Amino acid sequence: MILATTSSTFASLEEMVTVLSIDGGGIKGIIPGTILEFLEGQLQKMDNNADARLADYFDVIGGTSTGGLLTAMITTPNENNRPFAAANEIVPFYFEHGPHIFNSSTGQFFGPKYDGKYLMQVLQEKLGETRVHQALTEVAISSFDIKTNKPVIFTKSNLAKSPELDAKMYDICYSTAAAPTYFPPHYFATNTINGDKYKFNLVDGAVATVADPALLSVSVATRRAQEDPAFASIRSLNYKKMLLLSLGTGTTSEFDKTHTAEETAKWGALQWMLVIQQMTEAASSYMTDYYLSTVFQDLHSQNNYLRVQENALTGTTTKADDASEANMELLAQVGENLLKKPVSKDNPETYEEALKRFAKLLSDRKKLRANKASY
């Protein structure tokens, strides 16, 4: 549920800072891909512009793991300085390349499940030599450096102070997707402000931000507000001036029914290892959503935040690396069905209706800013 567009909101709408956040989740990126296709389609209809792209409407787009890949796809420029991928090309990308990225025949018993070679190959082909500074809007893509034991956040706004972060987009995308046990960590080097070599040893961004990067994306926006006049309205954490759309890759309603305290009391390290990551990711994603919902609500701006998430995945759709055609078809259907579901138990508005409202705000805001710039 989000702000209704009335004459009283237009004055403040122009000042709104818009943020899009996309979760990690491997092949489950098909779900937010479906949502993004719907949203971009609505924007194109409202603005009567088939070339309208999400990067034209969001001030910050952030993602981790597969969400980082989607972020790059919709913000990396092509030869015409437009996003190289439209939102309706995201799901076909997974269908074409997913089976090769998650090809079990390339894995080893001792070592990562997949060798990552095809993933790197397709990233290099699609993203070329493009670097962070060329992104068409502010980005926030996370990774984790296993040499320094610190998160690494790739954003445009950090480049003046830390030019070593101006890495190639394909290096960043592989790094944010390099989930331990699934893909090998990624090493690459850039140059510091003094010309020295700066070395990165990176793994999946979910290690740094878990699977939901919404807080990271908001933090990048508020930090940029200290220096960029375009973000001035959200200084002092004024979330009343922020529109946040957060897209999940789905969780399972069966998870909390799977185990009991009596059962797990007998578990050892191996049994816990099989489920602890799923537990941690589910809990962290819930807490991120809970925190943001609470903050926006306390500021009487709860309608400025929309979390789109499927909480009832079952069977193969819960797996981040099942890229069989049958499962990808199921994931695409999950995304389509999600649009028809209510936002929450307390809010009967469907996600489709909420996203249309969100699109209207984005469209109106863009027009207001364009009109102001023309004077």
Curated annotation (Swiss-Prot):
Q: Which GO terms describe its cellular component?
A: vacuole
Active site per the UniProt annotation: 65, 204
Give the residues annotated as coiled coil.
Answer: 349-373
Please give the tissue specificity annotation from the record for this chain. Answer: Tuber.
Which ranges carry the PNPLA domain?
A: 20-218
Q: Which GO terms describe its molecular function?
A: monoacylglycerol lipase activity; nutrient reservoir activity; phospholipase activity
Q: Where, by residue number, is the motif DGA/G?
A: 204-206
Per the annotation, the residue ranges of the short sequence motif GXGXXG are: 24-29
Give residue numbers for sequence motif GXSXG: 63-67
Q: Where in the cell is it found?
A: Vacuole
Q: Which named protein is this? A: Patatin-1-Kuras 2
Q: What is the lineage of its organism?
A: Eukaryota, Viridiplantae, Streptophyta, Embryophyta, Tracheophyta
The role this protein plays is: Probable lipolytic acyl hydrolase (LAH), an activity which is thought to be involved in the response of tubers to pathogens.
Q: What are the BP-aspect GO terms?
A: defense response; lipid catabolic process
Q: What else is noted?
A: Patatin have a dual role as a somatic storage protein and as an enzyme involved in host resistance.
Encoding gene, per UniProt annotation: pat1-k2
Keywords attached to this entry: Coiled coil, Glycoprotein, Hydrolase, Lipid degradation, Lipid metabolism, Plant defense, Signal, Storage protein, Vacuole
